[in-house]
């Protein structure tokens, strides 16, 4: 089974968010199952020279972009056992950053068409193209419109994974005519038309053979008016074509037993004393009073309403009257950045506000915190709660998307569960569940049980890769 994984970013070459982590970890896990999966992505100008100098030029050809033919080179690099192809075009991709340009519609029209054209030139007989988010969602449309008579393309099946429905690749309808060379019939409610524009993501949902979202709960949520981002009607109508497969994390990268970025290594059998040492060292590093009686609450997050920061804002004064310390790492909306800076100055023994991003500090927070706070308004899957559990930090989450699927609330009567959760987007519920978690923390035996259950959960890519493999196999039957 040969799969071409088309994506706009992949760790370690280019990363803005969780999509890059998926593009790194999922193909690696699928190759262990015997799937010959290869990643294809743009060769951005910001890719570190450590990698570009090792790339091998395979071939070059031209790609039709409207009435023009644009150069396309294919570079190759095998990284940690996964083959990567890079689409090389300096006009479109040799720029600072990856997204946010006025011509993103043209850039990713070109990239999508280049992926289709590359099928002619790669020494790789593709069975499935797996596309991701709006950047590559138009590939299934192009296969139908321009390549249905090509023997190399006719048999290809397509899978679309929606990592976040909010970003839909909406562009003026002229993009459809002038850049994608699609006829009038594609400007239709049942194809690309989205109000008076076109949506790449909508086209992918309609034309892909299978649509996957990154958790089962999110797959159900996006069929509703409140979470459907204007596409709920379409998503409700595609039935079993839409499935949810929860993301995993790379257990080789996220491993408290070997992580060189944390203070002291530990595992599920040694966490009790060694995790405490990480807590004390983190408190010391951040100039917080060193104490195990104080519950250390950590957050590594974008500071936006989507992440539930407005709920925290409404309870923060009351929260700081409790025996807790709050450590924040992240950046985002100016208002929330200033709010946390204010509380860090007003309560220097209770709040540490780190308005930036540091992978090293993030790992130290995962390892040193007692509780990880994630009260998101929406969360398609979420990776942070999985990392927190891997490091024995107990998550408090809102029951939405992948948070609901991955965190089982603790039941003190049965002793089962590895986190705490609340249902409604309400500050009173958040405050109540934090107080409940603090009451459980005071019972060390119960808390040890919760931490052990969290650390021994299998949130690696193994199970998820198996589900993707079954999706592929069903398409090729």
Curated annotation (Swiss-Prot):
Q: Keywords in UniProt for this one? A: Glycogen biosynthesis, Glycosyltransferase, Transferase
**So what family is this one in?**
Belongs to the glycosyltransferase 1 family. Bacterial/plant glycogen synthase subfamily.
Answer yes or no on keyword Lyase: no
Q: HAMAP family from the entry?
A: Glycogen_synth
| One matching Pfam family | Glycos_transf_1
Name of the molecule in the record: Glycogen synthase
Give, as in the UniProt entry, the pathway in which the protein acts. Glycan biosynthesis; glycogen biosynthesis
Q: Which Gene3D superfamilies match?
A: Glycogen Phosphorylase B
In the UniProt record, does the keyword Metal-binding occur? Answer: no
Q: Which GO terms describe its biological process?
A: glycogen biosynthetic process
Q: What sort of enzyme, by top EC class, is this?
A: transferase
Residues the record lists as binding ADP-alpha-D-glucose:
15
* SUPFAM superfamilies, alphabetized: UDP-Glycosyltransferase/glycogen phosphorylase
Q: Which organism is it from?
A: Caldicellulosiruptor saccharolyticus (strain ATCC 43494 / DSM 8903 / Tp8T 6331)
């Amino acid at each position: 089974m040969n799969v071409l994984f088309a994506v706009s970013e992949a760790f370690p070459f280019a990363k803005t968010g969780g999509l890059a982590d998926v593009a790194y970890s999922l193909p690696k896990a699928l190759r262990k199952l015997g799937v010959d999966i290869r990643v294809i992505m743009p060769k951005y100008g910001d890719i570190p020279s450590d990698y570009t100098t090792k790339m091998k030029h395979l071939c070059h050809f031209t790609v039709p972009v409207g009435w023009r033919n644009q150069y396309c080179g294919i570079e190759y690099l095998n990284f940690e056992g996964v083959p990567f192809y890079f689409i090389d075009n300096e006009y479109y991709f040799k720029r600072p950053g990856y997204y946010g340009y006025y011509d993103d519609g043209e850039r990713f029209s070109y990239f999508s068409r280049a992926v289709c054209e590359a099928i002619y030139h790669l020494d790789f007989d593709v069975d499935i193209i797996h596309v991701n988010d709006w950047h590559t969602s138009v590939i299934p449309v192009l296969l139908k419109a321009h390549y249905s008579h090509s023997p190399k393309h006719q048999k290809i099946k397509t899978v679309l994974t929606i990592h976040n429905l909010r970003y839909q690749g909406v562009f003026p309808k002229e993009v459809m005519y002038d850049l994608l060379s699609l006829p009038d019939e594609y400007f239709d409610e049942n194809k690309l038309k989205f109000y008076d524009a076109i949506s790449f993501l909508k086209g992918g949902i309609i034309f892909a053979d299978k649509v996957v979202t990154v958790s089962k709960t999110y797959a159900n949520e996006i069929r509703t008016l409140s979470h459907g981002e204007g596409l709920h009607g379409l998503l409700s109508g595609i039935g079993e074509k839409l499935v949810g497969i929860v993301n995993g994390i790379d257990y080789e990268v996220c491993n408290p037993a070997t992580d060189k970025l944390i203070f002291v290594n530990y595992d599920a059998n040694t966490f009790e004393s060694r995790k405490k040492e990480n807590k004390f060292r983190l408190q010391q590093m951040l100039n917080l009073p060193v104490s195990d009686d104080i519950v250390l609450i950590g957050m590594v997050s974008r500071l936006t309403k989507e992440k539930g920061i407005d709920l925290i804002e409404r309870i923060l004064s009351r929260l700081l009257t409790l025996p807790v310390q709050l450590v924040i790492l992240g950046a985002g909306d100016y208002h929330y950045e200033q709010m946390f800076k204010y509380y860090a100055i007003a309560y220097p023994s209770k709040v540490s506000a780190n308005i930036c991003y540091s992978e090293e500090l993030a790992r130290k927070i995962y390892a040193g915190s007692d509780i990880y706070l994630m009260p998101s308004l929406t969360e398609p899957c979420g990776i942070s709660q999985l990392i927190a559990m891997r490091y024995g930090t107990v998550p408090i989450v809102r029951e939405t998307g992948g948070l609901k699927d991955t965190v089982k609330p603790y039941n003190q009567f049965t002793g089962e569960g590895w986190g705490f959760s609340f249902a409604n987007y309400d500050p009173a519920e958040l405050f109540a569940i934090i107080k409940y978690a603090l009451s459980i923390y005071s019972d060390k035996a119960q808390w040890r049980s919760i931490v052990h259950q969290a650390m021994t959960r299998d949130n690696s890519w193994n199970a998820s890769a198996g589900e993707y493999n079954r999706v592929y196999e069903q398409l090729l039957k």
